[in-house]
């Protein structure tokens, strides 16, 4: 798994997580899943399956930091127990701004590029070139 609930403790105190989640792991796991889905939507030019299946040191540290920020934002929206919402909102906005820059191509993170699937001629880059099928005219 790309991000675990225990890794959220670098961004939130454990008692805060316990209060909001009411001691169940379903709520933080749902926030993590939502954060990963949101990050994937911005990283369509990259191999998201490889990126988000990485574990440990194989993960991109900057992307991990921003996915944590997004997950914490989704998580703390459930309740504001001891949370500085302005700080969380700024960190969330910063993460989304970074993902948008990557999406536009202004930033080039150290992530694996997307490759073409076997048997499919789907475009890999931003532009797809092609032509119409050849026609034969008979009179």
What spans do the regions from the language model cover?
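Short alpha-helix boundary/capping elements
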Residues: 36-43, 67, 75, 79
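Core structural elements
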Residues: 60-70
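Short loop/turn elements at secondary-structure junctions
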Residues: 73-139
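Conserved short "hinge" loops at termini or chain/domain junctions
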Residues: 1-61, 122-139
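Oligomerization/assembly interface segments of phage tail-like spikes and tubes
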Residues: 8, 69-73
């Amino acid at each position: 798994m790309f991000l675990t609930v225990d890794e959220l403790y670098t961004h939130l105190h454990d008692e805060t997580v316990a209060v909001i989640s009411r001691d169940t792991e379903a709520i933080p796991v749902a926030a993590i899943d939502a954060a990963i889905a949101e990050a994937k939507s911005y990283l369509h030019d990259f191999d998201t399956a490889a990126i988000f299946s990485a574990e440990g040191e194989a993960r991109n540290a900057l992307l991990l930091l921003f996915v944590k920020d997004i997950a914490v934002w989704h998580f703390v929206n459930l309740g504001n127990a001891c949370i500085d919402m302005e700080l969380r909102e700024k960190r969330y906005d910063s993460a989304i701004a970074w993902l948008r820059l990557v999406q536009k191509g202004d930033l080039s993170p150290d992530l694996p590029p997307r490759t073409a699937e076997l048997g499919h001629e789907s475009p890999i880059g931003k532009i797809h070139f092609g032509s119409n099928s050849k026609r034969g005219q008979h009179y």
